Amino acid sequence: MTDAQRRAAFTHLLHSFRSSQDQAPAQRWLLLEASHVLGQQLLGLHWRSHCWMLRHALQLRDGWEVAGQLLRLALVPAGHLLDRLPRGNTGRTTVPATLPMDMPPAISALIAEALRTTRRPPGQSPRA
């Protein structure tokens, strides 16, 4: 997948998250976790995914998750600088920050759907 495809699908997932206020918190977390897994390889997207996770944790008044997201935001630059990014890690405080993970099926499905939704035929330019 190209960086442009990754960015488009990442943006789609965040849009889905912002549009999902009527869904249960667990379902909304899945959207943020999918954005983290997808965006983890690009510093800007990785940073944004943790910022959104922090924001969501603050809205839920989840102190443990807030603390974990602050720690992860501190680790993101070093992880990229040292190329120590645990592939597939969902980015939540419920899993160790350095643990590589197999992608959970629900997250894999969300990423696949985001990629399908944002795919353009070759040669077609993005809409302005």
Where on the chain are the PLM-derived regions?
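TPR repeat positional signature
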Residues: 13, 31, 46, 50-53
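Internal catalytic or translocation cores that form aromatic/hydrophobic pockets or channels
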Residues: 54, 58-60
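N-terminal alpha-helical interaction modules that lie
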Residues: 1-40, 60-128
